[in-house]
A protein has these predicted regions:
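N-terminal alpha-helical transmembrane segments of multi-pass membrane transport
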Residues: 1-74
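Alpha-helical membrane segments and immediately flanking helix-loop junctions
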Residues: 88, 96-103, 117-127, 131, ...
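Entry/N-cap segments of selected transmembrane alpha helices
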Residues: 107-129, 280-307, 358-362
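Alpha-helical transmembrane segments
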Residues: 167-185, 295-303, 326-329
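Membrane-embedded hairpin module used as a gating/binding unit in multi-pass transport
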Residues: 175-251
Length: 383
């Protein structure tokens, strides 16, 4: 009888109920909210579902992220090994390859001035960097946090890992992906407030056709130029352009399909669940997390505003040929930010089609955010 009671007692002690803290319950509730937003509201489900599920798992069973050195048998938790690929910057780089294989840089090639709008939208990153330092973060932490302003989750994870700021990786990644999902909510008020009705109704000239040769040369030239100037961007820009070269060369269809689909989605699963698993209650429920979330919002809002303001400048310089609404697409949330530009413009003139014009700054923003990350790495001597 004692054996049975002891066995039952041990079984009960091993259940998660006996080890749950109030903080764990809060994070489980947050995971449920993310799942609701992803499944019911359709907010970036490919990202939020794995992130939310990783968050759920780690707060029910923390040892799923156990490091091997802390394990009795020397074997770590499952998601720890996924997370190691984040720390080594492997998964973010592979995500960029997949994005490159899915992306058409034609609108950017047809209108190179879009590069300027993509660059302007990176202002939010540098503004957030100095604000973060003012709030008490060290320079490397400030740099890792500020990249959230580009609305680019993989780059945020990449830079946090490279700068050794893994303690902030969970909040940074969750904030970055959350703001990517909330682009349709955050950007429109800024776009509407800082542009006139007349500017919103500006119709832009149709983009010129882009030849296949131009599309093939573009990833090669960008890789050579950017990586010669900032070699630290090679893992991101190099993989982005390699994926795009797969797509545009037309001779490696199997590689294109694999990079854009099978590999991309496998990496999203690994990246999402491992990022979610960094949000244990002990690591996430801190005042620092609130600061990071606030800084991310400031950075993203500043980036959107800078893009719109520079769009207004280009509108004046070109004699009203540029609709300032496409400036907000300079953040690297592809293609959500471009769709928002189209949606806001259509509210004022249903016959105004800005999507392809907005895609230029949007894809330029992907390159711009990677360059910003590479700049920080160069400043801190990280290779």
């Amino acid at each position: 009888m004692d054996y049975i009671l002891n066995t039952l007692s041990n079984l009960i002690a091993q259940t998660a109920f006996m080890n749950l803290t109030f903080g764990n319950l809060i994070m489980i509730f947050v995971a449920f909210i993310f799942l609701y937003l992803a499944i019911k509201k359709g907010f970036e489900p490919l990202l939020l579902v794995p992130i939310a599920f990783g968050m759920l798992l780690v707060n029910i069973y923390p040892d799923i992220m156990l490091r091997p050195e802390n394990s009795a048998n020397g074997v770590g938790g499952l998601l720890h090994y996924f997370y190691v690929l984040d720390e080594w910057s492997i998964l973010p780089s592979l995500i960029f390859m997949g994005v490159g294989a899915q992306t058409d840089f034609g609108p950017l090639i047809a209108n190179p001035k879009s590069f300027l709008l993509g660059a302007a939208a990176q202002f939010g990153i540098y503004a957030a960097y100095f604000i973060a330092i003012f709030m008490g973060f060290n320079d490397k932490a400030a740099a890792a946090i500020s990249i959230i302003g580009g609305a680019d989750g993989p780059t945020s994870i990449f830079l946090a890992g490279k700068l050794g700021q893994t303690e902030y990786l969970g909040p940074i990644a969750v904030a970055a992906y959350s703001y990517m999902a909330l682009v349709p909510i955050i950007q429109p008020p800024i776009m509407k407030f800082f542009t006139t009705d007349e500017e919103k109704r500006i119709k832009m000239e149709q983009l010129r056709p882009v030849s296949q040769l131009e599309k093939i040369l573009f990833p090669i030239i960008v890789t050579v130029v950017v990586c010669l100037i900032l070699p630290t961007t090679a893992p991101l820009v190099g993989m982005l352009m390699l994926g795009n070269l797969f797509k545009e060369s037309g001779v490696v269809k199997q590689l294109t399909e694999t990079a854009a689909n099978a590999m991309m989605y496998i990496v999203v699963i690994l990246l999402g669940t491992s990022v979610g698993a960094t949000t244990s209650a002990e690591a996430f429920l801190k005042v620092t997390t609130l600061k990071i979330v606030a800084l991310g919002l400031i950075a993203f809002a500043f980036g959107t505003l800078a893009g719109v303001i520079f769009g207004k400048v280009m509108c004046k310089v070109t004699g009203g040929k540029v609709n300032p609404l496409i400036g907000s697409a300079g953040v690297s949330a592809v293609p959500m930010a471009a769709r928002v530009s189209q949606k806001v413009g259509a509210e004022y003139d249903p016959t105004n089609f800005l999507l392809m014009h907005a895609m230029g700054p949007n894809v330029a923003g992907v390159i711009g955010t990677a360059v910003a990350a590479g700049t920080f790495m160069a400043i801190f001597g990280i290779v």
